[in-house]
Amino acid sequence: MNRKSVIQEYYILAVNEKGYMPSMRADESNAGLVAAGVMDLLLNEVVMIERKKITVVKEIPGELGHIASLYAYLKEKPRTIDKLMNDYMFSTGKRLKELTTEIGESLLSVHAVTEEKGGLFGNKIVYIPEPGSKERLVEVLRSAVLKEGRITPHDMALLCILKETKNLNQYFSKSEGADLKTRLKELKKDPQSKQLAEMVNYVEDMTAIIMCCVMTSIN
């Protein structure tokens, strides 16, 4: 299977058949999109995270052009994870819309999604994953969890974000979810998996902030 970036694969698995984030957890799912973009930058050593502050340390590579707007935002100055999530989730919505469009257009260019009109008045562009793309990607992730050996940083980031935003349960059985939970616990105890363990902690920090923001918006 031709793999894509973490944020592209997260989008494919998170949106529903109409090209929208699930209505019951739209805020968490959209915030997960931002977290996935940060993970792509982190995995490519474009940013570093220290004391929950994200700092750009080098130029973005061409293959991550679909998160150029996120990179430009972070390059302005170091941002805390809290500030990042608030700016993307609870300001005008312009940043999130721009990021979503970038992802959708990048997937459209490789025929991974189709572009259609959506919204109440049909004036919104939505990007719908091609049939079978979800299933193929889920099989890859399921195999990564169940087989022996280390899970790649890419797959670990994707799995963690899907899990923390409650978008994994629809694809994994209860026993498979338990297997992933066990793998995560083992990883955190393994001194040879320090980088992966740190990445899992970053995702957990981000999703904890996501939930706080969501609860604040509800109240």
Predicted segments with their positions:
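An acidic intrinsically disordered interaction segment
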Residues: M1-V6, L120-G132
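Ordered, amphipathic secondary-structure segments that act as subunit-interaction surfaces
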Residues: R79-E116
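Short, amphipathic alpha-helical interface elements at domain boundaries
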Residues: M1-K94, N201-N219
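Short hydrophobic helical membrane-anchoring segments positioned at the boundary
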Residues: S143-N219
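Short, Lys/Arg-rich nucleic-acid/phosphate-binding segment
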Residues: K52-I54, K117-F121
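Short, structured motif recognition centered on aromatic/hydrophobic residues
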Residues: V38-L41, L107, L158-K163
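Short, amphipathic alpha-helical interaction segments positioned at domain boundaries
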Residues: P61-Y88, L99, I125-C160, T165-L168
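Short, well-structured alpha-helical interface segments that form or flank functional binding sites
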Residues: G32-A36, E98, E102, M156
